[in-house]
């Protein structure tokens, strides 16, 4: 349950892929002395560390990292994660990054530079203890996949995606599926001109009373099954265009 890495010199390490993958009995992990200034890949670094309750990454230098896919996937016991100091300017992949982190009550990604990201698939999928999540400054101008991005975030009471640039997004399948505590959601500015899949996009959004999708361009959409399924409180829905 304990791993002593205090003597590790990581100054020349360029990849930390799968470094702690499957260490599912670790409860604590001290990587505060890690020098990550040369690391370019953190794919699945902490994946399936199911009992890890906290981790201090405040000293991580991520300025050269391009891949954070699956980084904290299935870290079921993490309750808080402060990544406000992460430099993500070169990262292109963040899919599944926090997928299955169902004990997280605090997650700070507000300073993420997402300008080079192409995939946000399943990024926050199953983060069902989060009551708030600030993604208002996310630059999504290069993202093509938002499938299940917020799926199962059933404790979120607010979510500001009004500034999302979705002009390149092709997949929105299940994007907000199961966000049952959201009482409002502004997607009125979404550019959906490239989207082909909207299946289950708002399925199970029980608390939404109004939803403006009147500006949605659905000319390329081939899948819409269950898009508003079980949106039981919707009293206003404009799909006239």
Residue ranges and their predicted role:
Residues 1-241:
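Negatively charged
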């Amino acid at each position: 349950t304990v791993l002593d890495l205090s003597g590790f010199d990581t100054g020349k390490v360029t990849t930390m892929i799968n470094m702690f993958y499957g260490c599912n009995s670790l409860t604590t992990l001290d990587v505060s002395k890690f020098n990550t200034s040369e690391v370019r890949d953190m794919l699945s670094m902490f994946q399936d560390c199911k009992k890890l309750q906290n981790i201090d990454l405040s000293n991580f230098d991520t300025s050269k990292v391009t891949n954070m896919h699956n980084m904290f996937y299935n870290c079921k016991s993490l309750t808080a994660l402060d990544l406000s100091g992460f430099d993500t300017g070169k990262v292109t992949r963040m899919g599944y990054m926090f997928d299955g982190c169902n004990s997280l009550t605090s997650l700070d990604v507000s300073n993420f530079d997402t300008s080079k990201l192409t995939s946000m698939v399943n990024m926050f999928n199953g983060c069902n203890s989060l009551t708030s999540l600030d993604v208002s400054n996310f630059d999504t101008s290069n993202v093509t996949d938002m499938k299940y991005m917020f799926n199962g975030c059933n404790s979120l009471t607010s979510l500001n995606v009004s500034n999302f640039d979705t002009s390149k997004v092709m997949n929105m399948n299940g994007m907000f599926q199961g966000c049952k505590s959201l009482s409002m959601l502004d997607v009125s500015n979404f550019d959906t001109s490239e989207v082909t899949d909207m299946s289950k996009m708002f399925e199970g959004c029980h608390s939404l009373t109004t939803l403006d999708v009147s500006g949605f361009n659905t000319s390329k959409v081939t899948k819409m099954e269950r898009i508003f399924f079980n949106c039981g409180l919707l009293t206003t829905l404009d799909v006239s265009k």
